[in-house]
Amino acid sequence: MVASAEADVPPPTMLVKIASAGLSACLADIITFPLDTAKVRLQVQGERPNAPGVKYKGVLGTIATVAKTEGPLKLYGGLPAGIQRQISFASLRIGLYDTVQEYFNAHRKTPATLGNKISAGLMTGCVTVFIGQPTEVAKVRMQAQSSLHWLKPRYSGTYNAYYVIVKTEGFLGLWKGTSLNLTRNVIINCTELVVYDVLKEALVKNNVLADDIPCHLLAALTAGFCTTALASPVDVVKTRFINSPPGYYPHVHNCALNMLQKEGLRAFFKGFVPSFLRLGSWTVIMHVTFEQLKKELMKSRQTVDCAT
C-alpha cells in the first residue's frame, strides 16, 4: 500500500501493522455483527423449506425479527468466535499483506506491480484460512441457530460449540468447509486488498485526494462492493455447508447442486444486500481505522524514542 502522506511519521513496522489490523478488524466486527447475523439467517433460509420457524424478509426485517423473537443479544450470537477469528485471521491476512508484497518485489527498484499485489493477497489469504477456520465454523453455527422455544439450540455458547463439534464430528469437524472458505477468502482477500491498494494509490498519485480519511473511505467502499459481488455465491454455499448437520450434504458440490435445483440461481445471491452492507461497512471501518491506528502507533513510538 502507498506510504503515508505525513513524511515525519516513519513507516509502520510489521508488528504495528499486525496489531493495527487485528484491533481494527475487531472493532469493525463488533459494529457490523448484527448485519452479519442477518446475512447468515437469510442465507440458510430455504435450506429446509418445511422446517418450523420464523421466516425472514430483508436485512432490517431480519434484524427486527431476531431482536423481537429472540432478544437483541441474539444478534451478537457467536461474537466471541468472531473476535477470535479477527485476531487469528484478519490481523495476519491484512497485517502481513505489505510485508509479503515487499518480499515479492524485493529484486525490483520500481513500485510493486499488480502481479505482486495479487500474489501477496493470494498467499496471505490462503495461509490464514487454515488458522482461522475453527472460529469461522463456530461463528456461523452460533449465528444460524435460533433460540425460539420450539427449536432446541445445538450449542449453548461459543466454547460449547467447539466442544460439541469435536465430540460429535471429530477434530476435523472444526475445519469443515475449509476448501470453500479457502476459495471465498482468496477471492475476498485479493479483491479487497488489491482494489483498495490500487485505487488508493491512483487517487493519491493523480492528486484526486490526499492520503487521508476521504481517500480511505472511497477506496474501502469500492473494494467492499467489488468483493461482495465476486464472493457472494461462494459465501452462500459455504454458509449452508458449514451449518449443515453431519451427512446432510455428502460433498460441497452436492450442496451447490441442491441449491441450484431447489431454489435456482438466485439462491446463490441470497443475503446479498446484508452481505454488502456488512462487508462494505466492515471494509470501510476496518481500513479507515487501520490507516489511522498505524499512524498514531508510529507517532507514539516516535515520541517514546525521542523521550528516551
Swiss-Prot record:
| Modified residue annotations for Cysteine sulfenic acid (-SOH) | 255
Check the record and name the Pfam families matching this protein: Mito_carr
The catalytic activity, as recorded, is: H(+)(in) = H(+)(out)
Q: Which UniProt keywords apply?
A: Ion channel, Ion transport, Membrane, Mitochondrion, Mitochondrion inner membrane, Oxidation, Repeat, Transmembrane, Transmembrane helix, Transport
A Gene Ontology term for the protein's cellular component: mitochondrial inner membrane
**Where is it localised?**
Mitochondrion inner membrane
- Transmembrane segments in this chain: where? 11-33, 75-97, 118-134, 180-196, 214-233, 268-290
Superkingdom: Eukaryota
Stretches of the chain found on the membrane's Mitochondrial intermembrane side: 1-10, 98-117, 197-213, 291-308
Q: In which tissues is it expressed?
A: Brown adipose tissue.
Give start and end residues of every Solcar repeat.
Answer: 11-103, 112-202, 211-296
GO biological process terms, alphabetically, are: adaptive thermogenesis; cellular response to fatty acid; cellular response to hormone stimulus; cellular response to reactive oxygen species; mitochondrial transmembrane transport; proton transmembrane transport; regulation of reactive oxygen species biosynthetic process; response to nutrient levels
Fill in the PTM field for this protein.
Answer: May undergo sulfenylation upon cold exposure. May increase the sensitivity of UCP1 thermogenic function to the activation by noradrenaline probably through structural effects. May undergo ubiquitin-mediated proteasomal degradation.
| InterPro entries, alphabetized | Mit_carrier (IPR002067), Mito_Metabolite_Transporter (IPR050391), Mitochondrial_sb/sol_carrier (IPR018108), Mt_carrier_dom_sf (IPR023395)
Q: How is its activity regulated?
A: Has no constitutive proton transporter activity and has to be activated by long-chain fatty acids/LCFAs. Inhibited by purine nucleotides. Both purine nucleotides and LCFAs bind the cytosolic side of the transporter and directly compete to activate or inhibit it. Activated by noradrenaline and reactive oxygen species. Despite lacking canonical translational encoding for selenocysteine, a small pool of the protein has been observed to selectively incorporate selenocysteine at 'Cys-255'.
Q: Give residue ranges on the Mitochondrial matrix side.
A: 34-74, 135-179, 234-267
How would you describe this protein's topology in the membrane?
Answer: Multi-pass membrane protein
Q: Where does fatty acid 16:0 bind?
A: 57, 270
Q: Name the protein family.
A: Belongs to the mitochondrial carrier (TC 2.A.29) family.
State its role.
Mitochondrial protein responsible for thermogenic respiration, a specialized capacity of brown adipose tissue and beige fat that participates in non-shivering adaptive thermogenesis to temperature and diet variations and more generally to the regulation of energy balance. Functions as a long-chain fatty acid/LCFA and proton symporter, simultaneously transporting one LCFA and one proton through the inner mitochondrial membrane. However, LCFAs remaining associated with the transporter via their hydrophobic tails, it results in an apparent transport of protons activated by LCFAs.
This protein's assembly is summarised as: Most probably functions as a monomer. Binds one purine nucleotide per monomer. However, has also been suggested to function as a homodimer or a homotetramer. Tightly associates with cardiolipin in the mitochondrion inner membrane; may stabilize and regulate its activity.
What is the protein's given name? Mitochondrial brown fat uncoupling protein 1
Give the originating organism.
Answer: Suncus murinus
Q: Gene symbol?
A: UCP1
